[in-house]
Amino acid sequence: MNYIMCRNNLSQSSLPQLSSSAVNDANIDYFSLKPKLSLDTNSSGNSEIIYSDCDNNKNNNDDDDDDDDYNKDTYDELLDPFDTIAVNQHDLEYYSPLTPFEIQNTSPQDSIISSKSSNKSNSLQPFPLTLPNLTNYRFLIVDDNIINLKILNRVLLKLYPRSNIVQVQDSKLVNEILQRQHFDSVFLDIEMPDITGIDIAKFIRSDERFNQMAVIAVTTRNSAKDLQQYKECGIDHTFHKPLNYSLDLIGGSIDDIIERRKSL
């Protein structure tokens, strides 16, 4: 069972599957629905998770308090249910953004990191983050793997504590979602069943309404040939899995891409 999941900084929310009736509802808002989040991935071993909303008890009109408390809010949000999930996929090597590794200071475009390489450092140090970006960005993450969705969601929440994030496992739903919601950036896995990240990127770039939408690939496929193909189909940037880059580098790259797209 595939779920659409949404995180809103002011009201915790999630999205159920798009049924035929929901698809026909032109007024659907993916940031306003409020059922609980589920991590059901057709596995009896995965339990149902419900998020708590650390922002519900705050005065939404007090921006100064929000600014002062963003560290606390971010910390609370990063206590992610992913930490309690037993990962049974023995070949999955995609590390938590909060797990310290040797920090990569080069561009993700120029530095391809093997998931089988020695990423773990003996002298562990956490990823640094100079200052979170408090812009209310809207992000869409598309990945058929629930664990990968959760990890990228955690990275983005640490970089952008006030962002609104929709997570989608079923790539066939992306077309309908893009017709109904605006996003500042879409993060795509490349290898997905039925509709790939390449297919989604081509669809986005074929519609001039989405010219200001950044498209970022997050994938293990980062050969020179792959990167050239991504560029040709309109993908703005590529991050390699696992995301063991400094948070400042990831955030700076995303900010630059969004700014460049909005200037078109």
Swiss-Prot record:
Q: Which UniProt keywords apply?
A: Phosphoprotein
Pinpoint the Response regulatory domain residues: 138-256
Record-listed 4-aspartylphosphate modification sites: D189
Concerning Pfam families, the annotation shows: Response_reg
Phosphoprotein as a keyword? Answer: yes
Q: Where are the transmembrane segments?
A: none
SUPFAM superfamilies, per this entry?
CheY-like (SSF52172)
| Chain intervals with Acidic residues compositional bias | 62-74
The UniProt annotation puts the region (Disordered) at 50-74
Summary of the function given for this chain in its UniProt record:
Required for stress adaptation, morphogenesis and virulence.
| Protein name per the record | Stress response regulator protein 1
